[in-house]
């Protein structure tokens, strides 16, 4: 095995270990925020939605700057600093008793993610070949599902005692992740050239096709982020106890571990990436329409399972499409900007979802937010269809963008 191949092989094991710590640290805390502040403390869902949307918008919206810094400075210092900043945000969240404190803690957590997320994503592109990238994304997503359940179970158990313990556990996991990166991550350059930071950002903004694709995904993310806000609230309403939320993540893990990789392997041989993304989005939006009408917990979990199946179909294709369109001369900047759709979708999805939930309760129309989310998904589907019909997306190795290391 050549030294380059060995480095790629070891690097992928490192990425999996790092991803485990990050996902567990995140899911210990964030799925329980709406339960803690809306159900236990009685805050308006809009206030909590603003906090979650702020976190999403700052982390993903400023990702292009984090990516540009990583292109210039390398991945390691950005990742370590970002993980420590997120740990600090979690500590502050544990003592939040006013909305502004929750917003500040979410902002700190988001700034940490702005620093570590783009270089981590760029490392995946650097350490995988184009033809194996889709399968590696599937493995990461399977791991995400398993670790999210472990994190949510740990957080739910700790919430029975004190929310401060929930936040402390998340902070400790991110400190461990920072130490792990400081100890084992080499000083990789994540782009093929070391250009000025503004050059990488300009290169992204001039790429009209990439920009259009990223912004079109805003509606997709408005649906996907509801696993952190609206779905836990709805489960708690139907079940009457917050502990039932953990079963949502158990369903996700069971479906992902059993279906994600086989579906990815089967579909990549038969369907284009664009088709897989649109098919998954179709399943997601159809599953959301009736949720507000369901009062039986088993039926609700069946719809949530259908939503996750749609995500299982769509997510590997979405990630691979984004990587295929990225210019390797500015990997960090491209991966940072690719999160802008998530920033906008998260901010609108969280705050808008919380607002629609409050309005629906006030008007006694509980299905209002779910109908609107389904409609947004349908509009997004039409936008993607039109974009892909005009010009199908080809893998990066075929469209003239070299695969430098």
Curated annotation (Swiss-Prot):
Localization recorded for this chain is: Cell inner membrane
What domain of life is recorded for the organism? Answer: Bacteria
Q: Does the keyword Phosphoprotein apply?
A: no
**Keyword list, A-Z:** Cell inner membrane, Cell membrane, Membrane, Transmembrane, Transmembrane helix, Transport
**Pfam families, alphabetized:** MFS_1
**InterPro entries from the xrefs?**
MFS, MFS_dom, MFS_trans_sf, MFS_Transporters, Multidrug-R_MdtH
Cite a GO CC annotation: plasma membrane
Membrane-related topology note? Multi-pass membrane protein
Q: Which PANTHER family match?
A: MULTIDRUG RESISTANCE PROTEIN MDTH (PTHR23517:SF2), RESISTANCE PROTEIN MDTM, PUTATIVE-RELATED-RELATED (PTHR23517)
Q: Which family does it belong to?
A: Belongs to the major facilitator superfamily. DHA1 family. MdtH (TC 2.A.1.2.21) subfamily.
> What protein name is recorded for this chain?
Multidrug resistance protein MdtH
Organism, by scientific name, is: Sodalis glossinidius (strain morsitans)
Question: Which gene is this protein's source?
Answer: mdtH
